[in-house]
């Protein structure tokens, strides 16, 4: 009975998303922001430390997280992979076995917390990686931050009990706000991150994210994780945009040393400030 109730909640949210798609089409007739017409009002850092991999997302239709869902058009899914392309070590149906689970999630820029969702448990994980939602919200536990008049970041699927901010609180770039989890509609632990034009998860439109002071590198291990062969289509957009199959990280200190370690050329990174 509980599973039926949860499925009903997911169905209601899906219907709201469909309503949002229709509303945005009516309002804008398909003329939504893209990388040619929109530049972020804020320069964002990645909402985590260390090396993570983009496993979904980009700024073109071919590699978009969910192109037909305007709010999530420029969303990203991030997780951590080892040298074999695995996202876990040990029992693969246990959240704690996954490298990204419990890692700190950080505010991507200065802003104000405008919405927090904290009531979802972690969803179950299957060996087939079928997506489940064990809570009443497909976002799971989430945080919505306003960074500019029409720029809000959404960070979703957070670990139960890990959110350490409250509505109305001012946060700084790089400040811990929660931990990576497996709550909401998800197949395994990861972070869902997007920038949207308003507070609504349903009727806002997604915005391409300009990242600053980060590095990005094509990684061979991604192909071992995902057989969709989308990696080639996201290569030439960095900086400032990242795409599927790239290993990414923040550059906060010792910039040149980190770039050399990653095999990258300093000259390519015009968005890295000295």
Where are these regions (language model features)?
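N-terminal accessory interaction module
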Residues: 1-5, 26-27, 41, 52, ...
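Generic structural motif
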Residues: 52-54, 105-115
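Zn2+-dependent peptidoglycan hydrolase active-site motif and core
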Residues: 100, 110-159
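Short histidine-centered loop motifs in beta-beta connectors
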Residues: 151-174
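Short hydrophobic beta/alpha edge segments that flank linear recognition/processing sites
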Residues: 172-184
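Acidic, glycine-rich catalytic/binding loops that coordinate metals and/or anionic ligands
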Residues: 194-274
């Amino acid at each position: 009975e509980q599973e039926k109730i949860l499925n009903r909640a997911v169905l209601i949210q899906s219907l709201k998303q469909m309503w949002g798609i229709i509303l945005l089409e009516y309002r804008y007739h398909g003329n939504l922001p893209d990388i040619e017409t929109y530049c972020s009002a804020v320069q964002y850092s990645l909402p985590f430390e260390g090396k993570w991999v983009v496993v979904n997302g980009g700024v073109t239709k071919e590699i978009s997280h969910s192109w037909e869902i305007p709010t999530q058009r420029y969303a990203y899914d991030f997780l951590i992979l080892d040298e074999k392309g695995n996202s876990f070590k040990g029992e693969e149906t246990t959240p704690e076995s996954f490298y990204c689970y419990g890692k700190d999630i950080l505010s991507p820029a200065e802003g104000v917390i405008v919405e927090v969702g904290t009531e979802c448990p972690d969803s179950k994980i299957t060996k087939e990686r079928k997506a489940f939602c064990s809570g009443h919200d497909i976002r799971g536990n989430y945080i919505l931050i306003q960074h500019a008049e029409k720029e809000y970041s959404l960070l979703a699927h957070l670990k139960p009990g890990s959110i350490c901010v409250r509505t109305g609180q001012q946060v700084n770039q790089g400040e811990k706000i929660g931990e990576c989890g497996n709550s909401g509609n998800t197949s395994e632990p990861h972070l869902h991150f997007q920038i949207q034009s308003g507070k609504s998860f349903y009727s806002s439109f997604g915005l391409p994210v300009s990242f600053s002071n980060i590095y990005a590198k094509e990684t061979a291990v991604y192909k071992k994780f995902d057989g969709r062969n989308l990696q080639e289509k996201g290569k030439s957009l960095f900086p400032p945009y990242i795409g599927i199959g790239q290993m990414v990280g923040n550059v906060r200190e010792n910039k040149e040393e980190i770039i050399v370690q990653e095999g990258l050329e300093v000259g390519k990174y015009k968005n890295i400030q000295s």
